[in-house]
Design a protein with these regions (language model features):
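Cross-family detector of peptidyl-prolyl cis-trans isomerase
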Residues: 1-209
Length: 209
C-alpha cells in the first residue's frame, strides 16, 4: 500500500496539502518533545526555505547542525531535571494516601479491583488491558481502541515486570512507575520525555502462558 492509498482516494493537490500539513505536525511534535516551546516561526520557515529553495543560508548547514544539537542537549538536561522533580513530588504526595502502597523499588500502586485468580510468573505471557498517562494526564498508550493485548512479562519495562508478578488475574490497579523503572534518562520519544514518571491503569485479564 503506497502513501496515496493510505491518504484515501483524493486528488493530487489535496494529497500534497495533507502530506505537507502532516509533515509539519510530526516535526512539531518531535520538537515539542525535545522541549522547544518558543520557536520564532519566521526564522524557522526561513531555514526550511533555505534548504528546499536552495537559497544562500544565513548560517551554514554545518554550523546550524552544531547550534541545534547543542541546544537540544541543554533542553534535554532541563527537561530531565524538571521531570525528575515533578515525579518525586507526585510520589511524595501519594505517600499521604493510605490507599496507595509503595514497594521498596519506589513503585506505587492502588488496588481498584482485587481479582482472585492466579499470580503470573516472570516467564508467563499475560493478557492485559491498560491506559498509560503522562503526569499532565495525557494518554500516551492505550488498548481502548485495539482491545486486550498479550505480552511476555520478561520483555516489559521493569515497573510492569514488578507489578504484574504481584497482581492476581481479574485485578485492576492504578500504578505509578518512577522513571528508573520505566524509560529512564533516554525516555521513549516522541511521547515519553527523559526521566518521566508514568501512570498506568492496568487490568490483568488472564495468564496465557
Amino acid at each position: 500500500m503506497d502513501i496515496y492509498d493510505l491518504l484515501g482516494k483524493i486528488d493530487h493537490t489535496e494529497d500534497q496539502d495533507k502530506v505537507s500539513y502532516s509533515a509539519g505536525v510530526v516535526f512539531a511534535m518531535s520538537l515539542k518533545d525535545m522541549g522547544f516551546e518558543d520557536l520564532k516561526y519566521d526564522d524557522f520557515i526561513d531555514g526550511m526555505k533555505t534548504i528546499f529553495e536552495k537559497t544562500t543560508p544565513k548560517i551554514s548547514p554545518k554550523k546550524s547542525i552544531d547550534i541545534f544539537n547543542n541546544y537540544v542537549m541543554l533542553l534535554r538536561q532541563d527537561l530531565s531535571m524538571k521531570n525528575e522533580e515533578e515525579g518525586k513530588a507526585l510520589l511524595e504526595k501519594n505517600r499521604e494516601n493510605p490507599k496507595i502502597i509503595e514497594l521498596e523499588s519506589g513503585l506505587q500502586y492502588e488496588i481498584l479491583v482485587q481479582g482472585n485468580g492466579e499470580i503470573p510468573k516472570i516467564t508467563d505471557e499475560v493478557e492485559v488491558e491498560y491506559e498509560g498517562y503522562l503526569l499532565d494526564s495525557q494518554v500516551f498508550d492505550s488498548t481502548k481502541d485495539i482491545g486486550a493485548q498479550v505480552f511476555r512479562i520478561s520483555e516489559m519495562i521493569e515497573g510492569w515486570k514488578e507489578v504484574l508478578t504481584k497482581m492476581q488475574e481479574g485485578s485492576r490497579w492504578k500504578v505509578y512507575i518512577p522513571s528508573h523503572l520505566a524509560y529512564g534518562e533516554n525516555g521513549a520519544p516522541p511521547m515519553i520525555q527523559p526521566n518521566a514518571t508514568l501512570v498506568f491503569i492496568i487490568e490483568l485479564n488472564k495468564i496465557v502462558r
